[in-house]
Amino acid sequence: MTSLLFDFSAPQSVTLWNPINDGVMGGISKSQLRYDPAGHAVFTGKVSFENNGGFASVRCQPGDLGRKDVTAYLLEVFGDGKRYKLNLRTDNSFDGVNYQVQFHPTAGTWTTCRLARADFLPSWRGKPVPDAPPLDTSRVRQIGLMIADRQEGAFELAIRLIAVETV
């Protein structure tokens, strides 16, 4: 069964998403999640390595995004050839453990990326957290998109929806 978390077909769909870029560490990368009148959102910006930077992200405001028995997260996206991460947080805090998985959508075409629950790994500021508990999808409070991993320059990921697949 599939359950929709975010449908980006309307302008108000992006209002709960905020940029969190490497400026928190002195960097100058920029990003935003904006609405495209074609009926989807666009995660766009520029990653810069200046001032020890190197990542850009957007995150939704905390809310009840938890679902039981999740087997995968589904993203319908139009890629630009770059690698991205989906971040999940199980609390309302700004900083702390993130459960993340990388995805590499096909460039130039709409595709559905299926991100298996088992592939989400706990990390803190990009470093593994081996002693963190496994992801409990029923406790998810925040969802985010990120670009990092030494990918300098402009980026643009169009996104129609984020959903969950459950048993």
Residue ranges of model-derived segments:
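Beta-rich carbohydrate-recognition modules and glycan-binding surfaces
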Residues: 1-167
